[in-house]
Design a protein with these regions (language model features):
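Helix-to-loop junction immediately C-terminal to a conserved catalytic motif
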Residues: 79
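Hydrophobic anchor residue at the start of the ABC signature
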Residues: 157
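ABC nucleotide-binding domain "signature" region
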Residues: 122-134, 250
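A short, proline-enriched helix->beta-strand linker immediately N-terminal to the Walker B motif
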Residues: 162-166
């Protein structure tokens, strides 16, 4: 079960019989992810430092933090894309990733992109079913270069969903979208999560986005989870709804931008991106590794 330095991340199915029950979280609920004592270093500096984390099955968790704090590195470890680690990491075998850049192969039509990395020779109908779920089936035969930004991101989501994941990992998937398309994409992800019932971990700088989507919000600082709060707000949610403003203020404080939203009229999204830009873009966490399709990544 443990993953020693230079050894692979273990999946639930690799650590026991195929019909074994998933591990229990600290509160007794089934856990989709369990991490204990995880450390990942770059050039002698621990980007993730003895981190512990449990994600419950079916829970939508959002991870916030400054650039370079280790959040994208953590996501890559959970995806199986970064294995130079020490510690214990248990994740479902069926997992998938969607990144900010859709990473579609320009020489393959959309439906073929959706099927990339799947074992065997799945038929076009399999891709079209996933594309229909994200409202893009009519573009199945299109070339990626003809897609809008929002369409390309939906194709990326279809590529993740076709794997029937128990864990969906999202690394700022809405960051490059315009405001209206971003809202629509957020709504789509919320609908897909409620329909699929898988665990979701979303990395973002947008505090409002976190509160609109999450069951639980984590703030990462100095390679560890520094703040962990449930989001006990009724769904569907709106910015400014009861309890929303207080939670936003608390999260902005944890992110080191206390008073930014209230004093200047700056939105929580803008505040989050502003604090992110103050950090070095040269950190290991800010430079995602190229994904490997055999570890559950949809690229």
């Amino acid at each position: 079960m443990a993953t020693d330095l230079h050894r692979p991340v273990k999946t639930l199915l690799e650590t026991g019989p195929a019909d074994a029950s998933p591990p229990a979280s600290h509160n007794g609920a089934d856990a989709a992810v369990r991490v204990e004592g995880l450390t990942r270093s770059f050039d002698g500096r621990a980007v993730i430092d003895d981190l512990d984390l449990t994600l419950k099955a079916g829970e939508f968790t959002v991870l916030l933090g400054r650039s370079g704090c280790g959040k994208s590195t953590l996501l890559r470890v959970l995806a199986g894309l970064d294995r130079e680690i020490s510690g214990t990491v248990l994740v479902p075998r069926r997992r998938a990733v969607a990144f900010q850049a859709p990473r579609l192969m320009p020489w393959k039509r959309v439906w073929r992109n959706v099927l990339l990395g799947l074992p065997g020779k799945p038929e076009r109908a399999v891709a079209e079913q996933a594309l229909a779920e994200v409202g893009l089936v009519e573009r199945a035969g299109a070339w990626p270069k003809t897609l809008s930004g929002g369409e390309a991101q939906r194709a990326s989501l279809a590529r993740a969903l076709v794997r029937e994941p128990d864990l969906l990992l999202l690394d700022e998937p809405f960051g490059a979208l315009d405001a209206l398309t971003r809202i629509k994409a957020q709504q789509l992800v919320a609908e897909l999560w409620q329909r699929r019932g898988c665990a979701v971990l979303l990395v973002t700088h947008d505090v409002d986005e976190a509160l609109l989507l999450a069951d639980r919000v984590l703030v990462m600082r100095d390679g560890r989870i520094a703040y962990d709060t449930p989001v006990a707000l009724d769904r569907p949610r709106e910015v400014g709804s009861p309890g929303f403003t207080d939670l936003r203020s608390r999260l902005l404080t944890e992110l080191g931008v206390e008073g930014a939203g209230r004093a200047t009229g700056l939105s929580a999204q803008s505040a989050g991106h502003a604090q992110a830009r103050t950090e070095s873009a040269e950190s290991p966490d800010a430079s995602p590794a190229r994904p490997h399709p055999h570890h559950g990544d949809p690229s």
